[in-house]
Amino acid sequence: MEERFYQFLRGHHVLHLATLGEQGLWCAPLFYALDEERIEFVVASDPKTRHTQGALQEPRIAGSVALETKSVGLIQGLQFEGIWKSEDPKARELYFKTFPLARALFPVLWRIEILHAKLTDNRLGFGKKLEFFRENHSL
């Protein structure tokens, strides 16, 4: 993934997740820690929530991270498609390093493996988009 993607994502901490499960479409904002090495988000979410249930039923998910601005010339945002996965020790370590106070809440953590991402950055020119495609991935 190109450095500009990481620069943008390092400046934010909330993604908007979209899922599709037996209850239909749903979306939710989630705090994220960014695993740059594995090109993944690490998020906390209760397994009973509608969006987590949807992701467990259909692990292909989508989402976005956006800069809120009223200036068209400053618009920046990332759209992504990914795979919802269980957490692992590396993900736990990263999440609690990013959000140390969350440890006391004993959250259930998940990983989102980014398969495809599109970064819009109007500072580079109106409608300028950069794309990332993961070559190898696993469900």
From Swiss-Prot:
SUPFAM superfamilies: FMN-binding split barrel
Superkingdom of origin: Bacteria
Family: Belongs to the UPF0306 family.
Name of the featured protein: UPF0306 protein WS0399
Lineage: Bacteria, Pseudomonadati, Campylobacterota, Epsilonproteobacteria, Campylobacterales
